[in-house]
Amino acid sequence: MQLDIRSDRPDVLTKFKALASEPRIKILEYLANHFCNLTEIAEALEMNLATVTMHVNVLEQAGLIVCEHRPGERGTQRVCSCQFDWFNVHMVRMREADIGKLLEFPIRIGSYSDFQ
């Protein structure tokens, strides 16, 4: 199965931010071949459980993995899996007709107070 990431979707930055981390990439690679709980991920990747939990939360919120609660030895455990074999990024291009609709405003340095 593949995941299509479109550059014109509002959630694209969430997905890219989730992918912009070496530990999260390692977790994704591990989950591509395993269906396991957080403790198993932490042990296999030699990471702290709290760190794995934080990274898994980011990946789940971005829709890159799926986690579900299942009965465990003591209470419930969170079991995770990667639902995708491929990630495709579709860059949306502007049509030539739309380029003329862009507005440009000259702003002198220091003429603004908020930026990111």
PLM regions and their residue ranges:
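Key DNA-contact positions within bacterial/archaeal DNA-binding proteins
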Residues: 49-50, 57
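Beta-hairpin "wing" of winged helix-turn-helix
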Residues: 64-75
